[in-house]
Protein backbone atom coordinates (compact mmCIF):
# COMPACT_ATOMS: atom_id res chain seq x y z
CA UNK A 1 0.00 0.00 0.00
CA UNK A 2 1.20 3.51 -0.82
CA UNK A 3 1.64 5.57 2.32
CA UNK A 4 2.70 9.11 3.16
CA UNK A 5 4.70 10.17 6.20
CA UNK A 6 5.16 13.81 7.24
CA UNK A 7 8.19 15.40 8.87
CA UNK A 8 9.26 18.83 10.09
CA UNK A 9 12.99 19.47 10.38
CA UNK A 10 15.05 22.63 10.94
CA UNK A 11 16.49 24.24 7.86
CA UNK A 12 18.70 27.29 7.42
CA UNK A 13 18.59 29.75 10.34
CA UNK A 14 16.58 27.16 12.28
CA UNK A 15 13.45 27.80 10.23
CA UNK A 16 11.21 24.75 9.96
CA UNK A 17 10.89 22.77 6.75
CA UNK A 18 7.88 20.56 6.11
CA UNK A 19 8.61 17.34 4.23
CA UNK A 20 6.63 14.31 3.18
CA UNK A 21 7.77 10.85 2.17
CA UNK A 22 5.60 8.80 -0.19
CA UNK A 23 6.45 5.10 -0.29
CA UNK A 24 5.16 1.57 -0.76
CA UNK A 25 5.04 -0.07 2.66
CA UNK A 26 6.17 -3.36 1.08
CA UNK A 27 9.37 -1.65 -0.12
CA UNK A 28 10.51 0.57 2.75
CA UNK A 29 14.18 0.49 1.72
CA UNK A 30 13.58 1.45 -1.91
CA UNK A 31 15.94 3.96 -3.56
CA UNK A 32 15.06 7.51 -2.55
CA UNK A 33 14.19 10.40 -4.84
CA UNK A 34 14.50 13.86 -3.28
CA UNK A 35 12.53 16.56 -5.10
CA UNK A 36 13.55 20.23 -4.97
CA UNK A 37 10.87 22.73 -6.02
CA UNK A 38 11.53 25.95 -7.89
CA UNK A 39 11.22 29.70 -7.37
CA UNK A 40 7.75 30.62 -6.07
CA UNK A 41 7.09 26.90 -5.70
CA UNK A 42 6.26 24.60 -2.79
CA UNK A 43 6.16 20.87 -2.18
CA UNK A 44 2.39 20.45 -2.63
CA UNK A 45 2.06 22.61 -5.74
CA UNK A 46 -0.09 21.30 -8.56
CA UNK A 47 0.89 17.79 -9.62
CA UNK A 48 3.73 17.23 -7.15
CA UNK A 49 1.69 14.76 -5.08
CA UNK A 50 0.77 12.79 -8.21
CA UNK A 51 4.45 12.78 -9.13
CA UNK A 52 5.28 11.30 -5.72
CA UNK A 53 2.52 8.71 -6.13
CA UNK A 54 3.81 7.69 -9.56
CA UNK A 55 7.35 7.00 -8.42
CA UNK A 56 6.22 5.27 -5.23
CA UNK A 57 4.13 2.92 -7.38
CA UNK A 58 7.17 2.21 -9.56
CA UNK A 59 9.74 1.17 -6.98
CA UNK A 60 11.01 4.36 -5.37
CA UNK A 61 10.53 6.39 -2.22
CA UNK A 62 9.78 10.06 -2.95
CA UNK A 63 10.72 12.81 -0.49
CA UNK A 64 9.65 16.38 -1.20
CA UNK A 65 10.08 19.40 1.01
CA UNK A 66 9.51 23.12 1.33
CA UNK A 67 12.67 25.20 1.27
CA UNK A 68 12.88 27.05 4.58
CA UNK A 69 12.56 30.53 3.05
CA UNK A 70 10.12 29.81 0.20
CA UNK A 71 7.45 32.05 1.75
CA UNK A 72 5.17 29.34 3.11
CA UNK A 73 4.94 28.42 6.78
CA UNK A 74 4.50 25.15 8.63
CA UNK A 75 0.97 26.31 9.54
CA UNK A 76 0.05 27.43 6.01
CA UNK A 77 2.13 25.32 3.62
CA UNK A 78 0.01 26.18 0.57
CA UNK A 79 0.17 29.97 0.80
CA UNK A 80 2.89 32.60 0.64
CA UNK A 81 2.12 34.16 4.01
CA UNK A 82 5.69 34.78 5.18
CA UNK A 83 7.08 37.26 2.69
CA UNK A 84 9.69 38.36 5.25
CA UNK A 85 11.31 34.94 5.00
CA UNK A 86 10.88 34.96 1.21
CA UNK A 87 12.71 38.30 1.05
CA UNK A 88 15.59 36.89 3.11
CA UNK A 89 16.12 33.85 0.90
CA UNK A 90 19.46 33.23 -0.82
CA UNK A 91 20.88 30.47 -2.97
CA UNK A 92 23.30 29.54 -0.20
CA UNK A 93 20.33 29.15 2.15
CA UNK A 94 18.69 26.74 -0.29
CA UNK A 95 21.90 24.71 -0.58
CA UNK A 96 22.00 24.52 3.22
CA UNK A 97 18.37 23.40 3.26
CA UNK A 98 18.98 20.69 0.67
CA UNK A 99 21.99 19.45 2.62
CA UNK A 100 19.83 19.19 5.76
CA UNK A 101 17.26 17.13 3.86
CA UNK A 102 19.93 14.79 2.47
CA UNK A 103 21.47 14.40 5.93
CA UNK A 104 18.03 13.56 7.34
CA UNK A 105 17.46 10.87 4.72
CA UNK A 106 21.01 9.53 4.92
CA UNK A 107 21.13 9.24 8.71
CA UNK A 108 17.92 7.25 8.95
CA UNK A 109 16.87 8.45 12.39
CA UNK A 110 13.19 8.94 11.44
CA UNK A 111 12.94 6.85 8.26
CA UNK A 112 14.87 3.88 6.87
CA UNK A 113 18.28 5.25 5.89
CA UNK A 114 18.71 5.97 2.20
CA UNK A 115 21.88 4.50 0.74
CA UNK A 116 20.81 5.37 -2.81
CA UNK A 117 19.76 9.00 -3.30
CA UNK A 118 18.59 10.57 -6.55
CA UNK A 119 17.83 14.27 -6.97
CA UNK A 120 15.10 15.80 -9.12
CA UNK A 121 15.17 19.60 -9.27
CA UNK A 122 12.69 21.87 -11.05
CA UNK A 123 13.60 25.32 -12.42
CA UNK A 124 15.60 27.15 -9.73
CA UNK A 125 15.57 23.91 -7.75
CA UNK A 126 17.34 22.40 -10.74
CA UNK A 127 20.17 24.90 -10.43
CA UNK A 128 20.44 24.20 -6.70
CA UNK A 129 20.44 20.45 -7.40
CA UNK A 130 23.22 20.74 -10.00
CA UNK A 131 25.50 22.50 -7.53
CA UNK A 132 24.68 20.04 -4.76
CA UNK A 133 25.30 17.05 -7.01
CA UNK A 134 28.71 18.43 -7.98
CA UNK A 135 29.54 18.74 -4.28
CA UNK A 136 28.03 15.58 -2.78
CA UNK A 137 28.98 12.00 -3.68
CA UNK A 138 25.94 10.69 -1.79
CA UNK A 139 23.84 11.72 -4.79
CA UNK A 140 23.96 8.87 -7.30
CA UNK A 141 21.94 10.36 -10.18
CA UNK A 142 20.56 13.78 -11.09
CA UNK A 143 17.45 14.78 -13.02
CA UNK A 144 16.77 18.42 -13.84
CA UNK A 145 13.43 19.57 -15.21
CA UNK A 146 13.15 22.98 -16.87
CA UNK A 147 16.29 24.00 -14.99
CA UNK A 148 17.92 27.38 -15.17
CA UNK A 149 21.54 27.53 -16.35
CA UNK A 150 22.34 30.63 -14.29
CA UNK A 151 20.76 32.29 -11.27
CA UNK A 152 20.94 35.78 -12.76
CA UNK A 153 18.51 34.58 -15.42
CA UNK A 154 15.76 34.77 -12.79
CA UNK A 155 15.40 38.54 -13.13
CA UNK A 156 15.92 41.23 -15.79
CA UNK A 157 19.56 42.32 -15.90
CA UNK A 158 18.49 45.95 -16.16
CA UNK A 159 16.75 45.66 -12.77
CA UNK A 160 19.97 44.98 -10.87
CA UNK A 161 21.22 48.57 -10.63
CA UNK A 162 17.97 49.82 -9.11
CA UNK A 163 17.82 46.74 -6.89
CA UNK A 164 21.24 47.50 -5.47
CA UNK A 165 20.32 51.15 -4.91
CA UNK A 166 16.98 50.49 -3.22
CA UNK A 167 17.94 47.30 -1.39
CA UNK A 168 14.72 45.55 -2.44
CA UNK A 169 13.08 44.29 -5.61
CA UNK A 170 9.56 42.94 -6.08
CA UNK A 171 8.63 40.04 -8.32
CA UNK A 172 5.05 39.57 -9.45
CA UNK A 173 3.33 36.25 -8.78
CA UNK A 174 0.89 35.85 -11.65
CA UNK A 175 -1.07 33.12 -9.85
CA UNK A 176 -1.56 34.79 -6.46
CA UNK A 177 -1.25 38.41 -7.71
CA UNK A 178 1.24 39.08 -4.90
CA UNK A 179 4.23 41.37 -5.24
CA UNK A 180 6.92 39.27 -3.58
CA UNK A 181 9.96 41.05 -2.11
CA UNK A 182 13.59 40.07 -2.61
CA UNK A 183 16.32 41.76 -0.61
CA UNK A 184 19.58 42.73 -2.26
CA UNK A 185 21.24 40.12 -0.04
CA UNK A 186 20.36 37.68 -2.82
CA UNK A 187 22.67 39.60 -5.16
CA UNK A 188 25.29 39.88 -2.44
CA UNK A 189 25.18 36.09 -2.10
CA UNK A 190 25.99 35.78 -5.80
CA UNK A 191 28.77 38.37 -5.46
CA UNK A 192 30.41 36.60 -2.53
CA UNK A 193 30.09 33.06 -3.84
CA UNK A 194 30.64 33.48 -7.57
CA UNK A 195 32.51 30.22 -8.10
CA UNK A 196 30.17 28.04 -6.07
CA UNK A 197 27.00 29.61 -7.49
CA UNK A 198 28.10 29.45 -11.14
CA UNK A 199 25.67 26.77 -12.32
CA UNK A 200 27.36 26.17 -15.68
CA UNK A 201 30.78 25.79 -14.05
CA UNK A 202 29.36 23.40 -11.47
CA UNK A 203 27.58 21.46 -14.22
CA UNK A 204 30.98 20.72 -15.73
CA UNK A 205 31.99 19.08 -12.43
CA UNK A 206 29.02 16.70 -12.23
CA UNK A 207 30.31 13.13 -12.67
CA UNK A 208 27.10 11.30 -11.77
CA UNK A 209 24.62 10.23 -14.47
CA UNK A 210 22.47 13.24 -15.32
CA UNK A 211 19.25 13.59 -17.29
CA UNK A 212 18.34 17.10 -18.48
CA UNK A 213 14.65 17.43 -19.39
CA UNK A 214 13.16 20.56 -20.93
CA UNK A 215 10.05 21.43 -22.91
CA UNK A 216 10.40 23.23 -26.22
CA UNK A 217 7.41 25.46 -25.37
CA UNK A 218 8.88 26.76 -22.10
CA UNK A 219 8.50 30.56 -22.11
CA UNK A 220 9.65 31.02 -18.50
CA UNK A 221 13.03 29.29 -18.86
CA UNK A 222 13.71 28.83 -22.58
CA UNK A 223 15.18 25.65 -24.03
CA UNK A 224 18.52 27.44 -24.49
CA UNK A 225 19.12 26.91 -20.76
CA UNK A 226 19.06 23.13 -21.24
CA UNK A 227 21.35 23.44 -24.24
CA UNK A 228 23.81 25.49 -22.18
CA UNK A 229 23.80 22.84 -19.44
CA UNK A 230 24.36 20.09 -22.01
CA UNK A 231 27.26 22.08 -23.48
CA UNK A 232 28.76 22.48 -20.00
CA UNK A 233 28.45 18.75 -19.31
CA UNK A 234 28.45 16.76 -22.57
CA UNK A 235 28.07 13.45 -20.72
CA UNK A 236 24.59 14.48 -19.55
CA UNK A 237 21.59 13.17 -21.48
CA UNK A 238 19.22 15.78 -22.92
CA UNK A 239 15.53 15.06 -23.47
CA UNK A 240 13.38 17.70 -25.16
CA UNK A 241 9.64 17.22 -24.66
CA UNK A 242 7.63 18.53 -27.63
CA UNK A 243 4.98 20.98 -26.50
CA UNK A 244 6.22 20.91 -22.92
CA UNK A 245 5.94 24.21 -21.08
CA UNK A 246 7.71 25.22 -17.85
CA UNK A 247 5.56 22.90 -15.72
CA UNK A 248 5.06 20.18 -18.37
CA UNK A 249 1.34 20.86 -18.66
CA UNK A 250 0.62 21.15 -14.94
CA UNK A 251 -0.96 24.04 -13.06
CA UNK A 252 -2.08 24.89 -9.54
CA UNK A 253 -4.46 23.80 -8.26
CA UNK A 254 -4.48 20.51 -10.20
CA UNK A 255 -7.88 18.86 -9.83
CA UNK A 256 -7.39 15.91 -12.17
CA UNK A 257 -6.37 12.50 -10.86
CA UNK A 258 -4.00 11.89 -13.77
CA UNK A 259 -0.82 13.59 -14.91
CA UNK A 260 -0.84 15.81 -18.02
CA UNK A 261 0.68 14.14 -21.08
CA UNK A 262 4.01 16.06 -21.13
CA UNK A 263 4.57 15.35 -17.43
CA UNK A 264 3.72 11.67 -17.92
CA UNK A 265 6.31 11.56 -20.69
CA UNK A 266 8.78 13.08 -18.23
CA UNK A 267 7.93 10.46 -15.59
CA UNK A 268 8.30 7.54 -17.98
CA UNK A 269 11.71 8.73 -19.17
CA UNK A 270 12.93 9.43 -15.63
CA UNK A 271 11.75 6.00 -14.50
CA UNK A 272 13.77 4.41 -17.28
CA UNK A 273 16.82 6.57 -16.48
CA UNK A 274 16.76 5.83 -12.75
CA UNK A 275 16.09 2.12 -13.23
CA UNK A 276 19.10 1.58 -15.51
CA UNK A 277 22.33 0.62 -13.76
Tell where the protein language model's regions lie, with residue ranges.
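N-terminal cap/lid segment of alpha/beta-hydrolase-fold proteins
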Residues: 1-27
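Short, surface-exposed "cap/lid" segments of acyl-processing enzymes
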Residues: 26-71
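Short alpha-helix in the alpha/beta-hydrolase fold that links the catalytic acid
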Residues: 48, 208, 222-231, 253
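Alpha/beta-hydrolase active-site loop
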Residues: 84-109
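Primarily recognizes the serine-hydrolase "nucleophile elbow" in alpha/beta-hydrolase
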Residues: 101-163
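Short beta-strand/loop motif that positions the catalytic acidic residue
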Residues: 205-207, 212-214, 218
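Acidic catalytic loop of the alpha/beta-hydrolase fold
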Residues: 217-221, 246
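Catalytic active-site module of serine/aspartate enzymes centered on a nucleophile-bearing elbow/loop
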Residues: 244-277
Amino acid sequence: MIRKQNFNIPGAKGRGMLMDLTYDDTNKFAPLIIFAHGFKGFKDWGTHNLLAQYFAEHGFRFLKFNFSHNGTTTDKPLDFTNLIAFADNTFTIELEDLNAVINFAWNGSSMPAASTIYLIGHSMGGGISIIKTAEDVRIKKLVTMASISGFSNLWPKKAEEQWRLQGMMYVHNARTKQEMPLKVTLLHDLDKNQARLNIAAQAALVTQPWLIVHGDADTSVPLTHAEELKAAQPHAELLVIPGGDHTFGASHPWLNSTLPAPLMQFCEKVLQFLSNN
